Curated annotation (Swiss-Prot):
Zn(2+) 2 binds at residues 442, 447, 460, 466. Zn(2+) 1 binds at residues 30, 35, 48, 54. Residues 526-540 have a biased composition (Polar residues). A zinc finger (CCHHC-type) spans 21-64, 433-476, 477-520, 791-834, 835-878, 884-927, 937-980. This is Myelin transcription factor 1. It comes from Homo sapiens. The lineage of its organism: Eukaryota, Metazoa, Chordata, Craniata, Vertebrata.
Amino acid sequence: MSLENEDKRARTRSKALRGPPETTAADLSCPTPGCTGSGHVRGKYSRHRSLQSCPLAKKRKLEGAEAEHLVSKRKSHPLKLALDEGYGVDSDGSEDTEVKDASVSDESEGTLEGAEAETSGQDEIHRPETAEGRSPVKSHFGSNPIGSATASSKGSYSSYQGIIATSLLNLGQIAEETLVEEDLGQAAKPGPGIVHLLQEAAEGAASEEGEKGLFIQPEDAEEVVEVTTERSQDLCPQSLEDAASEESSKQKGILSHEEEDEEEEEEEEEEEEDEEEEEEEEEEEEEEEEEEEEEEEEEEEEEEEEAAPDVIFQEDTSHTSAQKAPELRGPESPSPKPEYSVIVEVRSDDDKDEDTHSRKSTVTDESEMQDMMTRGNLGLLEQAIALKAEQVRTVCEPGCPPAEQSQLGLGEPGKAAKPLDTVRKSYYSKDPSRAEKREIKCPTPGCDGTGHVTGLYPHHRSLSGCPHKDRIPPEILAMHENVLKCPTPGCTGQGHVNSNRNTHRSLSGCPIAAAEKLAKSHEKQQPQTGDPSKSSSNSDRILRPMCFVKQLEVPPYGSYRPNVAPATPRANLAKELEKFSKVTFDYASFDAQVFGKRMLAPKIQTSETSPKAFQCFDYSQDAEAAHMAATAILNLSTRCWEMPENLSTKPQDLPSKSVDIEVDENGTLDLSMHKHRKRENAFPSSSSCSSSPGVKSPDASQRHSSTSAPSSSMTSPQSSQASRQDEWDRPLDYTKPSRLREEEPEESEPAAHSFASSEADDQEVSEENFEERKYPGEVTLTNFKLKFLSKDIKKELLTCPTPGCDGSGHITGNYASHRSLSGCPLADKSLRNLMAAHSADLKCPTPGCDGSGHITGNYASHRSLSGCPRAKKSGVKVAPTKDDKEDPELMKCPVPGCVGLGHISGKYASHRSASGCPLAARRQKEGSLNGSSFSWKSLKNEGPTCPTPGCDGSGHANGSFLTHRSLSGCPRATFAGKKGKLSGDEVLSPKFKTSDVLENDEEIKQLNQEIRDLNESNSEMEAAMVQLQSQISSMEKNLKNIEEENKLIEEQNEALFLELSGLSQALIQSLANIRLPHMEPICEQNFDAYVSTLTDMYSNQDPENKDLLESIKQAVRGIQV
């Protein structure tokens, strides 16, 4: 059957690629003629190549279906429907159904491959059986739906539904019954006119056969119900039992094929979605990166689907016994003839409007459907379809009498729907990558996924390709870069098969996950010793602590069978994590510049158990425990302040120890193991459990583990009995001689850089799982860097030498395992000077090379010139330069007493690192056993430096390195040195010219120039001041002159005023006796008016006033001016 499925998939893919002639012209646009791409349900793109979500094609198919319904006379089919004939015992249902299912599913997959949105109307019409019973049902329609003479009745149709629901619940017995049923009926062959509408449980894809296919759309719902009513009026009641028995035999024969078709079409839809994603990525510039992510998801699907069938059958069989008896008794009860006249009346305009509204909503209400389809939340989609199916079901139910409803099991829909819903959910839980991929959106607030570098998808988890990155605070940005790592605990992304990223989303390609599987297979092969209750079935859950989120409702320990793992699929993990990951981060405690500047001193509670032992948990308040577990998984860089006040109502008697993590003023975490060993001796761990004679004390066991096995912070396996014995029946004992023999090679080779050791990786993963599983008491979340406390000294050499750096934000990649400061954003000159001695030992021997661009990887720790792009292509391994001739100590092994013999990389004395030195390995092992740190550095700690005096390696053209030995990129080299005029003696010898002299000369010249500039500016300012002073003095003189002139003018004015007053008095006295007409005698009050009148009289000399004027002249003559 698998070969047939593959063959059908190949045929359908070829059919899907075959399109009408117009698709070749614009292969990236909608193939429907006249369609612009707008209004598509499946996405926002106008460049899809299929008809599956085109509203225009849907409308045309709808019109075609209506035209077929309105035809009054059609050519009758050679054979009648199976239900119309009553389906006798000898009617060959099984063999014919298999052939039809193969052809129909082939046509449906080729025509409407993965058409989930397009057939939403058909789902709503025929969903009652699927929504209630969760079973694929076949609806049969005759060639003449209006006036068919032999039509099936409502009773037989309802009995048929009950039989299908019952047979679906017996999925465990399908494999045996299929072979029997295939042999029972092989006689008649159906005609080509029979049309089957296969109702898929999740896809809802409709299939057509030949030119007589029938598509049921929402607008046709009223006609379909009426057709079913008219066709079923003429059937005799005696055919009910025959139809029921034959349909049960037919359904059992084809059920396995239908289930395979369901899985096949689901896979086809996934492949269609993958094709659409790949088409979009070709438009973008990150095609290779997204293809690698899709390969990860496909590999994860293959891994997860292996374990899913067991879970499905376990859940199916659990509900079979509860539902088998009532469902089987359903078809036996008789049912009177239903009244179908009521059905047409109940099918009112409201229902039709609702169907029309649902059809329009799939086209117009795009945002709602896009959100549902993008997230892939099948639960919401099923609820919507079930809701619509209930509306359609109300049309059929009023005409059915109570006896028939009880026959269908619809009187209590909850009882039938609930277990089948569970079966359906367990069936879809075997594809965790789809749910995880669609439910997790871009962490940028307000981002819908458009414009991303990695594709137009909102389900990525990183901020790397988000165009709205600038909207996010740097704290959240740095937090996501640190948190979103490989889901395998303890994995930094290094060594992955598909990429060296720490933000991948699957376990496929992870070397630690592979080691877990290998260790799990070894664990299964080990013989069980001791009491059978000491089950090792929980080893899988120990290796992956994320499963504790799902394992909240733990049954009693005795209910577990030996060697049987709990049936908890990891498929539901993404939904559980999304449910419990609604946490708030305390960004005030997060410092983006130096991670951990605040005094973080979390209490790390560790239990003295073996790496494989199952800790005793108290699940009395599993909701809080699940919340904290999900938070611990999703948030590894900040401490969760949302702690429940008490996660356990029982006293916690687990042996625990308090480890305070010290952070100095520079934000440096102390990762040494010796200080913690002293601290453990100073603060003994408190334990209320009585230790058996064969169990070491926590201090002694910890001391033993830290000295004999440096790669583990756990105690020896003999301390597994220290857990509480009242929680479990018996303590788990993994102290097997075979296990101890496997761990001996690890303890004897602590300096080996083997990342492929399954036992070492298994032990390390168990340790980090142990640190994450802290349900009881105060639940704290430690920084990801704190996990290096349990690593070996050899692993500390693989971290970034910058204090407080976890490897994120580096230029060469987001790796925490690089050994150089070249791309570290937190490194500065002071840190470079401090780490110069350590970084010089693990460099490429090529001068000026930091390890980037090498064929073997971006590592600075390689020991040969084989993959170095900067190495000379002359074939010389190491060409000694002048510097090496001057100082041959630079080309020797830095380990004191080593002559270069016995090295792993070759018998050369010219290497500069202790990575392959057997003497260094021996001394490092002795130092780790004695508890004292060993430094294999020679007395010459400076190492190869820039030959330019006073240069620390920063600012070079070829990189900011301390270890280059040439003047090629040195910014401090003098002009003569750059042209090669300086010899090696002149450059290197401090006797003739030291760096202080050079720097002093340059500083003196610069100071002299500055002094000259200051003098010039001072002189200019002095000249300006003199000019200003002269201007001020001249202005003061002018002011004095003006004041003197004003005084003179004032004096003149006073003299004139006195003279004027004297003249006015004389005039008054002279004219006192002369009176002008119409005026009083002159005085001081009317002096001005008198003078003006005289002036007018003299200007206008009137003959009448001549005498008066003469007299005035005579009187004024005596006045002297």
